[in-house]
Amino acid sequence: MLVRNKWNKKTYEVLEIENGKVTLKREDGSIFTIVQKEYITNYIKNNA
């Protein structure tokens, strides 16, 4: 699933949602993990 950050408008791919954490992949291929609360607050589903 693709999502967009509300603040910087960049698109990320959701790789995994597990144990209150969300793993995202940036357009450059790098991967990072955030807590699910931050994800819910700052990311929206990308309808493009």
Model-based region annotation:
Residues 17-20, 40-42:
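Short amphipathic alpha-helical "recognition" segments used for binding
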Residues 10-17:
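Short beta-strand-centered aromatic/proline hotspots
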Residues 22-26:
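SH3/SH3-like beta-barrel fold
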Residues 27-48:
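Intrinsically disordered, low-complexity, charged/polar segments
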Residues 1-8:
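Short coil-to-beta transition motif at edge beta-strands of beta-rich domains
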